[in-house]
Amino acid sequence: MDDNKKRALAAALGQIERQFGKGAVMRMGDHERQAIPAISTGSLGLDIALGIGGLPKGRIVEIYGPESSGKTTLTLSVIAEAQKNGATCAFVDAEHALDPEYAGKLGVNVDDLLVSQPDTGEQALEITDMLVRSNAVDVIIVDSVAALVPKAEIEGEMGDMHVGLQARLMSQALRKITGNIKNANCLVIFINQIRMKIGVMFGSPETTTGGNALKFYASVRLDIRRTGAVKEGDEVVGSETRVKIVKNKVSPPFRQAEFQILYGKGIYRNGEIIDLGVAQGLVEKSGAWYSYQGNKIGQGKANAAKYLQENPAIGAEIEKQIREKLLTAGAVAAAAKAAAAEADADDMADADAGY
């Protein structure tokens, strides 16, 4: 850059700082780059798939899926993990369906949890914005977008048509609160439901409620599905769950995590530690026996996981090694390369199919 341009740029930057305050415009190289702070999801596999060890603070996250797929369980698990680190959490219960007893079983400190059960969508989003602007709340859950019913629809007759009201409400609210969320370094999670588009011939007929605004403003979008049942004998005690990261602005997208959700207990974290420990060579498996550092910890996965539950220090040690091994810069770079290759393969498949 020549001297005239440098002087003109310096004058412009000086004027901007005087008018809008210091830091209104910054040169990226003048400041040290910092890792994005994250809050664990409670699932070790999902934390690793997200690339930064959890869900990013200061961002909007959308979690959607069919009924009974584990959406609320996953968000309550996020709250439980955040509270372990002293975070203040809020739950905006637009569905009026939060069960405090179930939340307590998942490890949520219900006594410290802020809960709101708003009457209208406008009220729910205004409360969310006020909590964000307080700069005192670290995690806010909105359950769910489908239940954010505009005031006009509530006050109207049952058969009245209100085209696009909810989409406009979400668009306006997200424009308003996105900047505040970044400034407050607050994680805001919107739970969403799935609907079917009528007359779709090609591609997926599934869509989410509330218009397209949330799709754009969300830094991370998680698609959660129940893929099977967890059984003890003939009794169903939980569900096999798969989460696909369909959008990720902080790490490579399109990665997946699979874990078990046990009824009344939540995410089966010790089972994940055993599986990932074996995959990374940290836990040895010989026949049905599992060993760690030469010591047998159990015959069968259930007994090995029970051993970790009874010896949390060993479980934490294995988990720490897994995180250090899989959340390094090299691992993320390799994942980015793999994700790009996967996306190219999907594009070629779509082209071959004529989409």
UniProtKB/Swiss-Prot annotation:
Gene3D superfamilies linked: P-loop containing nucleotide triphosphate hydrolases
Protein family per UniProt: Belongs to the RecA family.
GO annotation terms (biological process): DNA recombination; DNA repair; SOS response
Keyword DNA-binding recorded: yes
Name of the protein this chain belongs to: Protein RecA
Highest rank taxon of the organism: Bacteria
Job description of the protein: Can catalyze the hydrolysis of ATP in the presence of single-stranded DNA, the ATP-dependent uptake of single-stranded DNA by duplex DNA, and the ATP-dependent hybridization of homologous single-stranded DNAs. It interacts with LexA causing its activation and leading to its autocatalytic cleavage.
Binding site residues for ATP: G65, P66, E67, S68, S69, G70, K71, T72
Gene Ontology cellular component list: cytosol
Cellular localisation: Cytoplasm
